[in-house]
Amino acid sequence: MQRIMLRAKIHRAKVTQADLHYEGSCGIDADLLEAADIKVGEKIELYNINNGERFSTYAIQGARGSGEISLNGAAARCAHLGDLMIICTYGPMTDEEIATYTPKIVFVDEDNHFAGMKK
């Protein structure tokens, strides 16, 4: 049997841009994508800490070192600039994989730059 488990999380990232007329997606600073091992085009779940909104879209790469967290298309309606977000990915795992797996939890500073990983 497989279970859907948390694979990665970027915790408390601040929304820096919103573009309702862009085709969709969430732009994420390339440094954060790498740290969390989130791939371009991968489905992501977003949780808005400020208003409780929960929605899904896919990741696109933002400029490295920019601190970018941009919500595009319909997702732009789900948050305001400055809102804090939790960005997660999930994946199927067997009980054997779960026994030894630890999700990647990425922390950011006030400018959305990489600040460390959960130990």
Swiss-Prot record:
Record's cofactor remark: Binds 1 pyruvoyl group covalently per subunit.
Gene3D superfamilies: 2.40.40.20
Modified how: Is synthesized initially as an inactive proenzyme, which is activated by self-cleavage at a specific serine bond to produce a beta-subunit with a hydroxyl group at its C-terminus and an alpha-subunit with a pyruvoyl group at its N-terminus.
Principal EC category: lyase
Record: active site: 25 (schiff-base intermediate with substrate), 58 (proton donor)
Positions bound to substrate: 57, 73-75
Protein name (database record): Aspartate 1-decarboxylase
E.C. number(s) listed in UniProt: 4.1.1.11
Known catalytic reactions: L-aspartate + H(+) = beta-alanine + CO2
UniProt KW Cytoplasm keyword: yes
Pathway in which this enzyme or protein is active: Cofactor biosynthesis; (R)-pantothenate biosynthesis; beta-alanine from L-aspartate: step 1/1
Cofactors (names): pyruvate
TM helices/strands, residue ranges: none
A GO CC term assigned to this protein in UniProt: cytosol
